[in-house]
Amino acid sequence: MQTVNVDIAIVGAGGGGLRAAIAAAEANPNLKIALVSKVYPMRTHTVAAEGGAAAVIKEEDSYDKHFQDTVAGGDWLCEQDVVEYFVQHSPVEMTQLERWGCPWSRKADGDVNVRRFGGMKIERTWFAADKTGFHLLHTLFQTSIQYPQIQRFDEHFVLDILVDDGHARGMVAMNMMEGSLVQINANAVVIATGGGCRAFKFNTNGGIVTGDGLSMAYRHGVPLRDMEFVQYHPTGLPNTGILMTEGCRGEGGILVNKDGYRYLQDYGLGPETPIGKPQNKYMELGPRDKVSQAFWQEWKKGNTLKTAKGVDVVHLDLRHLGEKYLHERLPFICELASAYEGVNPVNEPIPVRPVVHYTMGGIEVDFNSETRIKGLFAVGECASSGLHGANRLGSNSLAELVVLGRVAGEYAAQRAVEAQSVNQSAVDAQAKDVVARLEALHKQEGNESWSEIRDEMGTVMEEGCGIYRDQASMQKAVDKIAELKERYKRIRVSDNSSVFNTDVLYTVELGYILDVAQSIANSAIERKESRGAHQRLDYTERDDVNYLKHTLAFYNENGAPRIEYSPVKITKSQPAKRVYGAEAEAQEAAAKAKEQANG
């Protein structure tokens, strides 16, 4: 096994990993940084983000407004000190990206253009047409290659992290191109591996997003926090799960049921707004959890349409925006709708349905993006920073990658310098154990198939932990995942080749994502309330008395995770009723009148 010695090792080369690498390199040019990625950086999942990144820019906007939208959107489960830091630093990072070359879309006068996004009461989403993730990632990637101290390990699959006496000390990875193994010794480790939505069958995530980093931290004793909160995006293509960005609705797209009726006005998101570029901040621009829940209600009422394959959908109608506007603002959406549904959005509505999109929960980290293991950091969707609470607002996540990616990189650089001497023999022994486990997997006898187990997992998670849940459905998921974890021990790996052995890769990935699925199901069944993306048919109300707290799932090698709780940090926004539409407008008008009266 090859050995490489660096100061910082970063797992994942998407937006969060790249930003952390750049920040660490700038913080201390003398540090050696390993950037380890399952794929070439421009193929990481950040590239799939379409809509934009949130940051205050308009004169009538403010940090406090962004803060209030985020906390209310997260149903008051956000860590409010993290939200305050985020809203203040996001404009700085957006400007930095521009200086590095990110081509933000512009208005005619040359100012940066911004669009509305769901749950935000003012336009603050910076965008680059509808390929924002691509342009953001390309900007970070081309910036990172300017730093010679960043050494890339592309197409390397991390098998485990190494920990000595409570301190992160590196990782073991498989070089997929050669089939060889490499031990990367480091004094700080940053996990930036994305979320765990592939625990569900119908999702927007790329094939590489299998909860790797979540599981690795989890198995080393770091709790996974708030895993029950899984976001359904309201508008995915029915046959593929490919996303129709929220920018479609931000630009004026509308959602209608089988009768052509804009049904969202019936679910606390009205009044109905004029068709065209929306002046109102609600209806189709309600938060994602509310809009997805409205679809479920329409489906129960029989108001959805059926595709040729029998899938229930509603229509996303963009026709009124016109061909020129669509091709200027949403060119990629037009391409995707045509390629995967045979629909030209200029002339026809797009069939859509909710699709699993984002895990609000993740690896528990503190204000500095550090876990309970010293020198182990996490950033992006794999991390539970506390920014998103029980429901993420669209466009906060791309901004999170760069704001908290910078934090993780800077503090990792600090930890790398401060690190005490390491018991290298103990670390080497751990690395050998990782190799032994991999060899044992090759020799494992049984007749189970990773593909069958993965399919069964996806189906039961959809049925048990979907948009709406109840005790019986979640118990079924809990029991089934426990059964699948036992069957996983009897998977037979039939491919003995060394180069790009996907049989081994998919088997190891399945072990990771089963951990994620179990943490989701077991966390969900213990939260006996409805909050944000966790909606129960048997506990329909939010319960701040008993459940205004974070769920912590601790790994148990021999069974179900141990569930504990931790408090929510509230700095200035006390829990209140979450309102949108006419009720929110009335509330805002009353507050404005009171402010004027107090003059």
UniProtKB/Swiss-Prot annotation:
Pfam families reported for this sequence: FAD_binding_2 (PF00890), Succ_DH_flav_C (PF02910)
Entry's localization field: Cell inner membrane
Top-level lineage group: Bacteria
Reactions catalysed according to its record: a quinone + succinate = fumarate + a quinol; a menaquinone + succinate = a menaquinol + fumarate
Cofactor comment text: Binds 1 FAD covalently per subunit.
Residues at the active site: 233, 249
Positions of FAD binding: 12-16, 36-38, 44-52, 156-158, 212, 357-358, 381, 392-398
Enzyme Commission identifier(s): 1.3.5.1
GO terms assigned for molecular function: electron transfer activity; flavin adenine dinucleotide binding; succinate dehydrogenase (quinone) activity; succinate dehydrogenase activity
UniProt keywords, alphabetically: Cell inner membrane, Cell membrane, Electron transport, FAD, Flavoprotein, Membrane, Nucleotide-binding, Oxidoreductase, Transport
SUPFAM superfamilies: FAD/NAD(P)-binding domain, Succinate dehydrogenase/fumarate reductase flavoprotein C-terminal domain, Succinate dehydrogenase/fumarate reductase flavoprotein, catalytic domain
InterPro entries linked to this entry: FAD-dep_OxRdtase_2_FAD-bd (IPR003953), FAD/NAD-bd_sf (IPR036188), FRD_SDH_FAD_BS (IPR003952), Fum_R/Succ_DH_flav-like_C_sf (IPR037099), Fum_Rdtase/Succ_DH_flav-like_C (IPR015939), Fum_red_fp (IPR005884), SdhA/FrdA/AprA (IPR030664), Succ_DH/fumarate_Rdtase_cat_sf (IPR027477)
Enzyme's top EC category: oxidoreductase
Cofactors (names): FAD
PANTHER family (UniProt xref): FUMARATE REDUCTASE FLAVOPROTEIN SUBUNIT, SUCCINATE DEHYDROGENASE 2 FLAVOPROTEIN SUBUNIT
UniProt subunit comment: Part of an enzyme complex containing four subunits: a flavoprotein (FrdA), an iron-sulfur protein (FrdB), and two hydrophobic anchor proteins (FrdC and FrdD).
Protein name as it appears in the record: Fumarate reductase flavoprotein subunit
Gene behind the chain: frdA
